[in-house]
From Swiss-Prot:
Belongs to the major facilitator superfamily. MFSD6 family. Residues 177-243 are annotated as: Disordered. Residues 177-191 have a biased composition (Polar residues). The keyword Transmembrane applies. The chain crosses the membrane at residues 41-61, 78-98, 270-290, 312-332, 345-365, 393-413, 425-445, 457-477, 480-500, 520-540, 546-566. PANTHER family: MAJOR FACILITATOR SUPERFAMILY DOMAIN-CONTAINING PROTEIN 6-LIKE (PTHR16172:SF41). This is Major facilitator superfamily domain-containing protein 6-like protein B. One of its GO terms (cellular component) is membrane. Residues 205-227 have a biased composition (Low complexity). It is a multi-pass membrane protein. Its main location: membrane. Keywords: Membrane, Transmembrane, Transmembrane helix. It is found in: Membrane. It comes from Xenopus laevis (African clawed frog).
């Protein structure tokens, strides 16, 4: 930036406020509901957990690297604008590919209807019958013999499949909820196993009966088969007629087909496509927030107004609340399919792209400044090195890791739990807004809390509140019950991070507080969320959502006990280097004992005390 340019702080803050507001509106139109879209693609919890885990891992590595590479004003502006534009396009691509199955979309859409309309829903057998079976074996096959007569061969596979699916569909005719959980059994693996065992016995029984019937008719059909073989024998040696493969060839072919089908079945193909698309999307979107925050902070630091940087998150929370309510209200007032048979879930991506395009135009005016000092590029490295140098920071880092790991289960699968009990998306949006606004309301009492409670008890209060939330989630009974418990989010999220930020200010060396705070958030929402996403998906697949949330509650209670035992034993004395208070360049600061001994002001004070003779 030119030195002759006028520095308008009010205008810069106004643009930054609108930037963060619109970006969070667009972000919360889609991101909290992304796993619902993956579920409609037919992906299970374990596959969704892998996708989200890789998404967090890419952000963990790519965002700080891009921030390090963007060392000039032009590069930072380019990263911000390109990230907004390309991520909007990459997100909008999901609205068209991979395509959604209309039967699955209708099934999910039906769960959000009013309760009176769910009592006797129409049964569509095509939802439950496999497509290949219905098209290939649904009707008996007629074959004409050499005598001109028709023999009807029973399609036993189709009869068994239709019988079992009709039985299951009749069982599910009473309520839509039962029908929904049978098609997408994320929370009832025992029921699914029993039903599978019952259907297996039925298939085996029908197979034995079929075998007995076929043995009776084999004698009558043997003459027809022999005459048919005699008539077709002259054609067997024709070069254009393929011969029947040998037993060895059939075995090799069957093995290769089984391997290909098991590895590249439709579900895994969709999984690999979605995983690749999400990774590319995250590569495009990850640099935005980190670089934008660094640019604004260094801009305000240059004009000595960094105190105004800490309040921009309020506008981000307001935008997130408005975005979540807006998109869910819109979705619930749309039909299952709108013009051109576009499913209504696609409007999450359309609104995301639209608001990011609006933010793109604001980015042309976004305040960007790159400090000429070298200490800004070294602060992140110092913060990483500081994580292992102080026991209090190590304990805090482990706490935020646990917090990020268990918190990812709420972000990824809470709406699955709500969907299983028949919730529409409006309740989901209200739950997001309730949590954010409750944290925003408690913020005005933050200083009073910091004065009343110590760091230890604020962390315990936050972890205990989060544990209560998890226990509550495991026993959800109605959709609206989630909105009430989200009030505790003010303590489980807000109070913990306020306590951590205050601890960082007390422990970190001057000038590195913000870098250490960013590092801890990077550890929580990068490492912790990635590990939590990977683990939670497999836990849901093996057990259920309720078991997952109960396990998270037990984990938090266990960590509270560990925290209370370890925290009092850590040293609580901070070494103060007085000469750094007068230093003009923060890059020369050091917290080592050797530097403490060489402090000229401390040495002078010691000499003065030793020379006194009273």
């Amino acid at each position: 930036m030119s030195s002759t340019k006028q520095w308008d702080i009010s205008k810069a803050l106004a643009v930054a406020t609108l930037f963060h507001f619109f970006h969070n509106v667009g972000k919360f139109c889609l991101m909290p509901f992304l796993t619902l879209y993956f579920r409609q693609l037919g992906l299970g919890a374990s596959l969704v957990g892998i996708i989200i885990g890789f998404k967090h891992a890419v952000h963990l590595l790519w965002a700080p690297l891009c921030s390090f590479l963007a060392k000039s004003h032009r590069k930072r502006r380019f990263f911000i604008m390109a990230s907004l534009l390309l991520s909007a396009g990459a997100g909008g691509l999901f609205a068209f590919y991979p395509p959604l199955d209309k039967n699955i979309v209708s099934l999910f859409c039906n769960t959000s209807m009013p309760w009176k309309e769910q009592l006797n829903p129409p049964i569509d057998i095509s939802v439950f019958v496999d497509e290949n079976i219905s098209t290939t074996y649904a009707t008996p096959t007629n074959h004409q013999t050499t005598n001109g007569e028709f023999n009807t061969f029973p399609s036993s596979v189709a009869e068994v499949a239709i019988d079992t699916t009709m039985a299951s569909s009749l069982d599910m005719k009473t309520t839509t909820h039962q029908r929904f959980t049978d098609q997408f059994p994320s929370s009832s693996p025992l029921t699914r196993n029993k039903r599978l065992e019952h259907q297996t016995r039925k298939v085996l029984g029908s197979g034995k009966a079929q075998k007995a019937n076929s043995s009776k008719s084999s004698a009558s059909n043997s003459k027809q088969r022999s005459s048919l073989n005699n008539q077709t024998a002259p054609f067997a040696t024709h070069p254009n007629v393929s011969h029947r493969p040998s037993i060895h060839e059939r075995k090799v072919r069957d093995i290769s087909i089984d391997f290909t089908d098991s590895f590249l079945d439709p579900k895994h193909k969709i999984f690999l496509i979605v995983l690749a698309m999400v990774i590319i999307w995250e590569i495009l979107a990850a640099p935005l927030e980190w670089i934008a925050d660094d640019s604004l902070y260094e801009y305000l630091d240059f004009v000595d107004a960094t105190d105004r940087h800490g309040k921009l998150w309020i506008w981000g929370y307001l935008g997130a609340s408005m975005g979540s309510i807006f998109i869910t209200f819109l979705i619930d007032n749309l039909n299952c399919f709108v013009i051109f048979d576009i499913p209504r879930v696609s409007f999450h991506f359309f609104c995301y792209g639209g608001f990011l395009i609006s933010t793109f135009f604001l980015s042309t005016l976004y305040p960007v400044h790159v400090s000429k000092k070298t200490e800004h590029s070294n602060k992140t490295v110092k913060a990483l090195g500081f994580l292992g140098s102080d026991g209090r920071i190590v304990l805090t880092a482990l706490t935020v890791f646990v917090l990020g790991a268990v918190g990812s289960t709420i972000q990824n699968f809470l709406f699955w739990q709500m969907q299983d009990i028949g919730s529409n998306e409006l309740y989901m949006g209200l739950s997001i807004a309730a949590g954010l606004l409750s944290e925003l309301a408690l913020y005005f009492f933050r200083n009073k809390l910091l004065k009343t409670l110590t760091f230890k008890w604020m962390v315990v209060l936050g972890l205990l509140s989060l544990g209560i939330q998890f226990l509550y989630y495991s026993f959800l009974w109605t959709p609206w019950s989630v909105v009430a418990i989200q009030i505790l989010n003010a303590f489980s999220s807000g109070v913990i991070w306020w306590a951590i930020n205050s601890q960082v200010v007390d422990v970190a060396s001057p000038g590195t507080e913000r870098s250490l705070q960013l590092t801890l958030r990077w550890l929580a929402y990068g490492c912790g969320s990635s590990a939590g996403s990977f683990a939670s998906g497999f836990i849901i697949s093996r057990f259920s959502l309720a078991v997952l949330y109960q396990a998270c509650c037990i984990t938090l209670l266990t960590w509270i006990v560990i925290f209370l035992l370890v925290q009092p034993k850590l040293p609580n004395i901070k070494k103060i280097n007085y000469s750094r208070l007068l230093a003009a360049d923060n890059s020369d600061m050091s917290d080592s004992d050797e530097e403490q001994d060489r402090d000229w002001l401390v040495t002078a004070m010691k000499d003065e005390n030793s020379n006194r003779k009273w």
